[in-house]
Amino acid sequence: MASYRYRAPTRYINADVSVDNLLRTIDSMSRQCRSRNETESELARVRSIITLYRPHLQNRVDLQVAELVLEALMPPNGAQEITHNFNYKYDYNTNSGGGAPPPFFPVGPARPTDAFGAPIAPSEPTPASAPSPPKADAPNPIQQNVYINSAGEAARPSSPRPPPPPASGGGAVALMQVDDADELALKNDYDTLTREYTLVSYKRLVRTLVPVSQKYIINDLFVRGLAKLCSVELLLNNDLGALVDCINREAALNIRPDTPDLCRLLVAMIRGFFILASSATRQEYTLARCDSAALVEEEVWSVKTALDQRMSRLADELETARDKLTQTASRLNRAELELRESRETTLMLKRQVEMNEALRRPARFDDEL
């Protein structure tokens, strides 16, 4: 008991390690995982909103969210797909010339829209019989930018017209139509992923997207990049390995990341701390109310203080018991000595009585004669 009391705490690389280091590490990794999941969820929500209002961008899975936002804000006046080098050139209306704004010349057969998807009516074309102004007096036509001027400044009101057919030029993007079987398979896997957001359902959806992409998209790089999404499990394994390495480093343990009993091992360690804390505080102990590393450290410190106080009380009680035992042993020794002396005195008295009796017997015999 005394050796346990004065034993030094475990040290590893000149640092004290205890269960609170393990709990602090687990809490930190949990916060990082929750933050990463929230970020990915927000990005997926932004992408779904963009594809809801811009259905023609559903096939642009190769773009990041920032590039997809820029692609969605561009007016459909021609081929304006974003490349990864961000070399797109924007033309802004400077409204130079002082007088009335120059006439708007629509570029391409596509109908312009504003930033929110509302169609903008183009200006009426100049009649063929009207004489064209001289080239020296006419300013250079400036393409109208729908993000600077409003819809009223962009064009005069006109009767609505049906949208023109998609352009057949090389820069136009043709929308992909998926057959019913592929659409049903994608819908089933997507619904499964929505109900059960697990790694298995995620990989099942990716494995369904790969053959569909090979069937409708002639781009080997896109298909290989889509298939690469199945390796997301490696990221999770790396995160688990980093967690186990941190636990081994901070707590001086030797845990393997691939052990099948990793969860049970960690639970056994935490449960052992609960048992020790319950024994120290003499009540059922739990960390359910502790949601941060600071609170866990406070609880560990309080348990350590209670355990030290109890050990101190036990040591004092043991010392008192030893003193009482010593006093009792001393009294027993004295009582034994007294008993021995009493026995010796009794024997001496008995001998004297016998001697007196022996001396009286001859005198009595003489009297009888």
UniProtKB/Swiss-Prot annotation:
Residues 110-172 are annotated as: Disordered. This is Uncharacterized protein in POL 5'region. InterPro entries: Desmo_N. Residues 110-121 have a biased composition (Low complexity). It comes from Lymantria dispar multicapsid nuclear polyhedrosis virus (LdMNPV). Residues 122-136 have a biased composition (Pro residues). It comes from the Viruses.
